[in-house]
Amino acid sequence: MALLDDVKSELAAFEGDSPAAIKAQAAAMIRFGGGLRPVQNTYVIQAVFTSLDVAEWLKNTLRNTFGHEAEVNHLTRQTPNGPVETYVVLVTRNVVALALQTGLVDRRKQQVRGLPSEVVNGSIAQIKAAWRGAFMARGFLSDPGKASFLEIACPTEEAAMALCGVARRLGIQAKHRTLRSSERVTLKDPDAIERMLKLMGATRSAREWTGKRSDGEARGKANRLANFDDANMRRSAKAAAEASEKVQHAFEVLGDNIPDNLRQAGQLRIDHVDKSLEELGKIAEPQITKDAIAGRIRRLLQLAEKTEKARAAEGK
């Protein structure tokens, strides 16, 4: 748990976000950490965390950004594996107003089961902040030496689907699964995990996690790259890596405005940097030729370039 605690503390210390991103992070922390709770004919907002740094961040943000006071209660419960420390952020006054501000309820005062629409349709900075908040609340990370995974336990299926959806806007394919009646969003590819940690703001922890992991798949990739004897294969690997970076940038530029066939081709290039175009075509669904894969990636990059030029022209 030490590395996970370090990740959450690093995220709690992240600075430089816009007010909209800070609000998105706080909303996700409350949504995934607890939410609106009925208590004796009234409501409270409650969020439970395993990190004091995380709880203090939310308490301070509720005061400084939203103008609401919250208290942090420290609880200890005994488990078969020993005592577990938790920190409960509790708001008991002006609860409905805060619920509206954070998107826990909509304008009709109906509870939102997923993520607030302002977050789902927000900027890339808001998307990163929402993932950061969800991870701070209910995130898990594999220990070095074990099979790689990054996972978030979600309060509802709708929240899990929303988290997967906004991850695609970051160019990352997250998977939703149900485990013993618990909704989970999971990343298993080591490269995607490292990228998500960096996008959330845990750059130091990402380096530490990557340096320590001894994942068999990671070793296999490293060995294949290290053992390239053919100069043509080296050039192909370099070109694939460069194409992957360009596709990642295209995803960030275009957001949701990407045709499905182009998005699929781009995602395959990102997820399988070490594979040739022919191999990408074989694992596509349905299978397509290497020329078709190359053409779709080329059109994706051209669309991003055209969009960037149009935005630059509008800004003049």
From Swiss-Prot:
Feature: DNA-binding region: 276-309
GO biological process, one term: cell division
Organism superkingdom: Bacteria
Gene3D superfamilies per record: Homing endonucleases (3.10.28.10)
Keyword match Nucleotide-binding: no
UniProt cross-references to InterPro entries, sorted A to Z: Homing_endonucl (IPR027434), Sporu_reg_WhiA_N_dom (IPR018478), Sporulation_regulator_WhiA (IPR003802), Sporulation_regulator_WhiA_C (IPR023054), WhiA_LAGLIDADG_dom (IPR039518)
Pfam families linked to this entry: HTH_WhiA, LAGLIDADG_WhiA, WhiA_N
A molecular function (GO) term: DNA binding
Keywords attached to this entry: Cell cycle, Cell division, DNA-binding
Keyword DNA-binding: yes
Function: Involved in cell division and chromosome segregation.
Family stated for the protein in its record: Belongs to the WhiA family.
Protein name: Probable cell division protein WhiA
Protein's organism: Bifidobacterium longum (strain NCC 2705)
